[in-house]
Structures are given as C-alpha cells and as structure tokens.
Amino acid sequence: MEVKEINIAHIAQVCIENVFRTSTAKPGYVHLNFGKNLSSTEFRSIMVDLKNELSKFTTKQFNSTLAYHWLVRFDQQVNTPFHLDNAEDQSFLMLGYEPSEVDSELYLADYVKYANDSKVESTECIEKITPIFKEDESLLAPYVTKVSSFNSDTYRIVFINNSKPKSFPEMLGVFHKVLIVTPDVTKSRIVNSMILNLLPKGMINKNEPSEEAFLNTDIISK
C-alpha cells in the first residue's frame, strides 16, 4: 500500500483489517510504502504513533495493551529462514526499513494454512514447525507470498502477525524470511524493529524498552 497522506488512524485501520486475524482468510501482514520524503526520526515517530494507535484498538478489543518486547535499530545483511521472532504467543512485528542501496527481498509464509492442510493435527503441526521452519522450504511454496514493490530507496513499514496460537481461535501468525540480494558491507541496510506483545490491561512490563531512546538514538546495532 502506497501511503500518500500520513493519517495514523486510517493506517491503523488497514493494519487491523489485515493483520489481526483469527482465520487464514486475511493475509496476516500489511506493507506500507511512505516514499522518500521523510527523515529517519520522522519515520520512527510514525512507527511509534502507529503502535500507540493500535494499542488503543487492542485495549478495547482484547483488554490488552501492546507492550514493547523489543525495540531496536540494526544493520541487517544476513539471510534468514522462515521463522517467527522470539516473543509471547500473541505478538506482532513491526519492521521499519530505511532507504538503502542494499537490495533485499521479504517473503511471508502462512504456516497456519500449511498446518491446516497437513495430515497432522493442526496444533501438533504448529508446535513442530515453529518458531523456525527447518524442513524443506519447497513444502511451504503454495503458502508463500513475496512482498511486492519492496523498493529499497523508500521508507517502508511491514507489520506482521508474529503469533503462535496455543489454541483456537487465538490470533494467527505468519512466518517471515529475508533474502539479501546484493550484500555489501560498505553500505548500510537499516531496519527499525519492534516486537509487540499483547499485555493484559493492568499488568506492567518492568523491562519494557525505552520509546524515547528509540526515537532519539543514533546507535545502530550490528
């Protein structure tokens, strides 16, 4: 989705409709392209505003806030397998990509649909294949989506359902996988990464990362 006007409430609604899923009829992710006319600080501020808007929704819908499990900026030029990031069973991943000369591709795989179509009972299959898919990736091929128009010269957010359901109907996640097409250690590929857990209202995460530090830091992890 190309974002022509930064309306956080509208963007959040798109995320809610596509990512907060309890069936495989929805994709479980959304790709937002903000173009080139932003600064890194402005971009990170959009990410934080979007997270906070989505937290209003989860508070009303699930009586749970979205709490930071992980909040960091890093320079990533490493291929990954299909996987879920380490987090609570009901969680979300917000990846904010800054413009880069390093070409990359992002793939999503609906592991829940794969599990439903397998000959093994769904919850048993999910337990076996998560958090990292270690089997032949060709088995996932019918369930894989390559994120289109993943232009490396623009600011982009990909918001992903990172959940691992223990029972149904909990929210259903999707795997993600990155492929670095042209690695180049002389250049940077900066990813702003948020992992968000559903935290029951009233509970406090004493180890929650600092939102202010994320917005103002110049530190890039390797």
Predicted regions and their residues:
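Short, solvent-exposed loop/turn segments at secondary-structure junctions
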Residues: 36-39, 99-101, 163-166
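Short, well-ordered loop/turn elements at secondary-structure boundaries
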Residues: 25-28, 76, 87-90, 151-155
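N-terminal auxiliary "cap/dimerization" subdomain that precedes the catalytic jelly-roll/cupin core
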Residues: 1-61, 216-222
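Catalytic core of Fe(II)/2-oxoglutarate
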Residues: 135-222
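Conserved double-stranded beta-helix
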Residues: 52-114, 128-132, 139-144, 198
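Short, surface-exposed, charged loop/turn segments at secondary-structure junctions
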Residues: 108-119, 171-180
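Short, cationic low-complexity segments
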Residues: 113-135, 216-222
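A structural signal for short, well-ordered beta-strand segments and their strand-loop junctions
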Residues: 30-33, 93-95, 105-107, 157-161
